[in-house]
Amino acid sequence: MPPRTRQGLAILATALALGLVADLLAHQVPARLDVALGLGALVLALVALVQGGHVVLPAALAPLGAPLALLAAALIWRDSPTLFALNLLGVGSVAALASPRVRAAGPRRAGLGDYAVGAAELAWASAGGAAALVLADIDWAALPVEGRLRHARGTVVGLAAAVPVAAVFGGLLMQADPVFDRLVGRTLQIDLAPLASHAGLVLLWGWLAAGVVRVLCRPEAGVARPRSGGTLGLGEVGTVLAVVDLLFLAFVVVQFRYLFGGADLVRGLTGVSYAEYARRGFFELVTVAALSLPMLLLADWSLDQRDPLRARRFRRLALLMLLLLDVMLASALFRMRLYTESYGLTELRFYTTAFMGWLVLVLGWFGATVLRGRRERFGTGALLAGWLVLAALNLANPDAVIAGVNLDRAAAGRPLDADYAAELSADALPAFRRGLPRLGTVEACAAATRLERRWGDERAGKARWTIALARAPRGPIDCGAGRSG
């Protein structure tokens, strides 16, 4: 049997086993835990293939085990659905590192294009890799026809031929005798809906697993394309940057004059409160910073930098934009602080602030790499910055932070949104149990009632399992005052 066929059969059998495991996890294991265990099953399947001598995994995959294990643990650590989605995104970034395209370029030199192609490569492998495995990798004509395999093939062919024959004769005999008809009907009374559900899940996850395992085990990796030089001159690229720099500079001057100038100055000019003034700009400023980064990357890529003088002028314009963006992000952070003091903290505000922190890191890394002629190092650094922010989010426990900030505001006499408090995940429950008793207000008791009702129902359903949900204290929540109704 050719080695490629032997490897293909091993991958196919492993994929079917993973499909069975996925079906079992989907039906028997609570949500969140099933995803973490599924990742573990995939890793164990790869190890089993290597230990059995069926495949040889690229050496570049070994260092990815540690971040994948940490992310799998993070999936079941916190209860926040938003953080769960971000952790899944982190798993996807590890998968992109494992793609043949990124492996070929090397993690230290893989650019953003390599990561994009690698992600597309994995997506395509998941969708169509199983078909290539069955139709191209496995030479079915080369399979041995003697011994057990021959007998097994004969049995399968015989069963396939016997089914329609038995169906025809059985139908005639059932019509001939009503007693026989009833006995056969009772014996073959099968509910096909659950069987179809199980079979569909096994085939779906087996199909996806076959494509993923195949591309991870593929020894040949695509050749990374060298970066092509830009063709545009400084007149085209520099004009765009200069105009944007002037616009940013004008905005920054306004920030120093009014936002950082105090509430009286703002109220006298606009007629609105300081908090209302700050409320309008946070998300817009973060969007401006997020759009500026790809614009700078595109400008660097499109500029013909063979002339050193032209390259230096471009870098000065880009560096000025980075400095102005830092001031604008500081303005956004200042606005968020005022906004939170007046209106409280929500998930959207918290995670947008975290995204802003990632932007600060990436903009600094852009200046340290791209503006110094080391563009190929930017992609991996941006990815590592994302991992750093993700780790900080998992350690910080966002929902607990949100609950703590809003409880502190309530203790200072500000209103507490009981409905929003009940929408937070189980990560916030310990903070509410500590903070609500010291309030002793009607709003606190309303929040306690909503929290008890929600988490009593969710725990009874056992729809998901996380460490935070399992460890959250049970029982009534004290609100520091007697409840009515």
For each feature predicted by the language model, list its residue ranges.
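Short aromatic-rich membrane-water interface segments that cap or initiate transmembrane helices
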Residues: 154, 187-201, 269-287, 345-356
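Transmembrane-helix bundle segments that line or gate the permeation/cavity pathway
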Residues: 23-181, 197-219
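Hydrophobic alpha-helical transmembrane segments in integral membrane proteins
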Residues: 374-379, 390-416
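Extracytosolic and intramembrane catalytic regions of membrane-associated proteins
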Residues: 422-485
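Juxtamembrane membrane-water interface segments of multi-pass membrane proteins
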Residues: 1-9, 13, 26-29, 48-60, ...
